[in-house]
Amino acid sequence: MMAQRNSGAPDNAGGSNDGREGGRGRRDNRDDRRGGRDNAEKSNYLERVVTINRVSKVVKGGRRFSFTALVIVGDGHGLVGVGYGKAKEVPAAIAKGVDEARKNFFRVPLIGGTITHPVQGEDSAGVVMLRPASAGTGVIAGGAARAVLECAGVHDILAKSLGSDNAINVVHATVAALKQLQRPEEVAARRGLPIEDVAPAGMLRARAEFAAAAAQGGSHG
């Protein structure tokens, strides 16, 4: 009788271990699937790290170092955001910047890969002027402004920095300019005029061609 009880104990213990291992395996699989969905969602966006700085704070025991990262995130189709992350390690600072940028998303009105009208944005000492450009011009802009424009999906534009060359100021001035953009319909409604009186004929023609091309591509798909 004793032998039977002793021989049965290890079998039960082994079964409980198998159950625990199976539970851990199922949890790991769920985490892997959840991580895969998160990675797929993040991969749909363009990310640009504009600048990384090391900052120090004097404390009682000496200096404490950390890193800051200025990050631009966009979908390349008119949606863009800017984030600023701070952490003890560079990857963590970038990750925080990405999360903040996605919380700050805003929509940029575009027509055929360029902006709807000239605009100038200011933030602190940064001043950035943006002008529409014809197809094939490309993004004529400095590094900091270029990162914002490319993530927003602008393909043809003329940009010039008129103020501070500090990357943070340039980025925020570029964002301020983009947030001032309006669609021709909005301008026409505000002025109480037909859209043909407030938008150049070339812009309206380009918008019509772009819409027709998009509709044709959708029908083939």
UniProtKB/Swiss-Prot annotation:
Q: Name one GO cellular component term.
A: small ribosomal subunit
| One Pfam family, short name | Ribosomal_S5_C
Give the PROSITE patterns listed for this entry: RIBOSOMAL_S5 (PS00585), S5_DSRBD (PS50881)
Q: Which GO terms describe its biological process?
A: translation
S5 DRBM domain spans which residues? 45-108
What keywords is this UniProt entry annotated with?
Ribonucleoprotein, Ribosomal protein, RNA-binding, rRNA-binding
Question: InterPro entries given for it?
Answer: Ribosomal_Su5_D2-typ_SF, Ribosomal_uS5, Ribosomal_uS5_bac-type, Ribosomal_uS5_C, Ribosomal_uS5_N, Ribosomal_uS5_N_CS, Ribsml_uS5_D2-typ_fold_subgr
Notes on the domains: The N-terminal domain interacts with the head of the 30S subunit; the C-terminal domain interacts with the body and contacts protein S4. The interaction surface between S4 and S5 is involved in control of translational fidelity.
Q: Any idea what this protein is called?
A: Small ribosomal subunit protein uS5
Tell me the organism: Mycobacteroides abscessus (strain ATCC 19977 / DSM 44196 / CCUG 20993 / CIP 104536 / JCM 13569 / NCTC 13031 / TMC 1543 / L948) (Mycobacterium abscessus)
Q: Which gene encodes it?
A: rpsE
